[in-house]
Amino acid sequence: MISVVIPLYNKEKQIAYTLQSVFEQTFQDFEIVVVDDGSTDNSVEKVEKFDDSRIRLIHQTNAGVSAARNRGIEEARGELIAFLDADDEWMPEYLATQYGLYQKYPECSVYACNYEFRDSEGKVTPTIIRKLPFEGEDGVLSNYFEVASCSHPPICSISIMVKKTAIQAIGGFPLGIKSGEDLLTWARLAVNEKFAYSRKVLSVFIETKSDMNISKAQMRAGSEGQVLVELLLLYDREKNHVLKSQLKKYIIRWYKIYAVIQIEIGQGHKAIKIAYKAMVFGGTVKSFFPILILGMLPNKLSRILFL
């Protein structure tokens, strides 16, 4: 049995569509663990309208998405856990494909597929995934960090299934990080476990219209900084030279993300400091030169040019 874990917080308009996409799976041996993280809208009522014994609704006071996912992991009865966010969807073959990877690659503990973005008007944007280490439809993703350093993230929070023992071994999802907590979790799994991956696009990340205002960007800046610190700790502990080299490229990309966000919120001087740290770590002057230039411009001008 696969345990589908869905963290839920104020998604009354989307949760029914999300649950329906699970019930429409061709693979039907699953349970759904919905963890309500203190919703204040009608999300819970929407879930309760589904008359199916495979749904378990767990309530907790608001503690954030990582805490909700961790509670779902704890409550899960299956050996395999598939994560799905309360405002996204799966295509009908999703769980069957993931279970197929589980059967085909017994040496792996993490299973993932490709995904796509869909906006509120139905426009679909595909991901760009480069340097997969296999030619066929699926295979072992032996170079996760290399792929992640030059592509969209090959794995997202709605396109992954993992053995319960593997996610518990790394302590679940990190608490206190509000953005990028999922990517840090995949990184921690990547240094400990083997990944199986399918090129099939079977998960739909639904984008809502929301402008990136300064307060949201500031929150991301803090979170991205926390993730970067944790990635550097992984790098310092890693003994495998090949994996360490790939992780280094991934960290340099995070330095760039962190610096760009600083420019977004008008902190050009911080962006310059981050760029210098990245170049000391191994980033090239060429790749960070635009950030250095933007960081030296007046805040208003740099934001206009950047955005």
Predicted region positions:
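Cell-envelope/extracellular polymer assembly enzymes that use nucleotide-activated donors
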Residues: 1-3, 21, 31, 184
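Short, well-formed alpha-helical segments that are part of the catalytic scaffolds
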Residues: 11-24
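A conserved acidic beta->alpha catalytic loop
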Residues: 21, 28, 36-45, 61-63, ...
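Glycine-rich, basic loop-to-helix element that forms the pyrophosphate-binding segment
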Residues: 60-76, 97
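Flexible acidic/His/Gly-enriched loops in nucleotide-sugar-dependent glycosyltransferase catalytic domains
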Residues: 65, 95-101, 107-166, 170
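Conserved nucleotide-sugar donor-binding catalytic segment
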Residues: 74, 134-225
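Short aromatic/hydrophobic "clamp" motif used to bind/position activated sugar donors
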Residues: 81
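C-terminal subregions of glycosyltransferases and related glycan-biosynthesis enzymes
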Residues: 207-307
